[in-house]
Amino acid sequence: VTKWNCQITKASEIPSVMAKAFYIARSGRPGPVLIDITKDAQFDTFDFSYEKCIGIRSYKPVPEIEPTAIAEAAEAINNAKKPFIIWGQGVVLGNAEQEFKDFVEKSGIPAAWTILGLSALPTAHPLNVGMVGMHGNYGPNMLTNECDLLIAIGMRFDDRVTGDLNTYAKQAKVIHFEIDPAEVNKNVKADIPVMGSCKDSLAVILSLIKNNTHGKWINRFDEYMKIELEKVIDKDLNPTKEGLTMGEAIMAINK
């Protein structure tokens, strides 16, 4: 699946099409483009001239921020008792790590990552509760179905994250911070879609949310982590067979 595709039939079209292709691929939500250059165009000759593409009239890579949506999202965040953040690669691609960290710390909301969002918040951060999805941690996966507000930031609700959509976070109101309109309501319905780059959106909403803590709610994640340590991690570190396990090797390296 590509963001855009084009067939070139004349060699003279190559510079303008390539400039357009790079602009589309790198702007907004980055993604692949396909350029099909016919054999005739490959063997043709022309006077080469290249001009960088800086915009396309029919293509708006970054939606404008809607103040109404930002205000509605801020109100929901301020009133939530058990809010939960899931962030993805959009935070990293949007260079929004600092804005995201400020948002998490001011709101006091526990946050979990999809595999491509990992680096946006240090894993040792007290509000980083682990990874979601089929390869993720026990607590974040279980408590997705217990939160009253699910805040998705720069992630697309992939099936490796959600599992069965028929039972995924049905109890929660969903806020979706997203740059690509095609991703909103595609897999999980967003009660409050917040369109725009997450860097800009988080910077704007930061002044509207309260300084908050969610101690009892965060304790639930700690409880599940203890269960995971006892039933999964400790078991892996203390095998009944001979030889080192992967878990033991990792622990030895960490020490």
Question: Model features per residue range: what roles?
Answer:
Residues 14-16, 89-96, 242-244:
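Active-site glycine- and acidic-residue-rich loops that bind
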Residues 20, 24-79, 233:
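Conformationally flexible catalytic loops at phosphate/diphosphate-handling active centers
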Residues 225-255:
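Active-site diphosphate/adenylate-binding microenvironment
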Residues 65, 72-150, 252-255:
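Anionic-ligand anchoring segments at beta-strand to alpha-helix junctions in alpha/beta enzyme folds, i.e.
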